[in-house]
Design a protein with these regions (language model features):
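Structural motif
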Residues: 4, 47-50
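Non-catalytic, surface beta->alpha helical segment in thiol-disulfide oxidoreductase systems
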Residues: 60-97
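Short glycine-/acidic-enriched loop or helix-start segments at secondary-structure transitions
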Residues: 22-23, 47, 69-70
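N-terminal post-signal-peptidase region of extra-cytosolic proteins
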Residues: 40-45
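Structural micro-motif
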Residues: 50-61
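Extracytoplasmic/periplasmic, Sec-exported soluble proteins
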Residues: 38-39, 50, 77-81
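Local sequence-structure signature of Cys/Sec-based thiol-disulfide redox active-site neighborhoods
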Residues: 3-36
């Protein structure tokens, strides 16, 4: 479960139904953020708006601004770890103080 902190940090995982075997399950374990999942096949405008070229892609937003992006490799599997993404979230929070 992701607990919402004082900032507006949001982590969005973009994927597609045909690639559901590569969903990033640990996203739900991130803390101090809001989490969302967008299926780009169901919401193609989101794919265009955020220039999603490969799935899955995880984007960290702070107050609506993209801070960091993690993209899958050629095998459609993401190489970033939960620790990598959480470190960016923690850094964003630390910089707010």
């Amino acid at each position: 479960m992701c607990f919402f902190a004082h900032s507006q940090i949001e982590v969005i995982q973009y994927n597609a139904g045909w690639n559901s075997s590569n969903d990033v399950q640990w996203c739900n374990d991130l803390i101090d953020c809001e989490i969302d999942y967008i299926d780009i096949a169901a919401k193609p405008k989101q794919q265009v708006k955020y220039k999603i070229e490969v799935v899955p892609t995880i984007i960290i937003f702070d107050d609506g601004e993209e801070i960091e992006r993690f993209e899958a490799d050629i095998s459609f599997a993401i190489q970033a770890t939960e620790e990598d993404v959480q470190a960016y979230i923690d850094e964003i929070l630390a910089n707010k103080f």
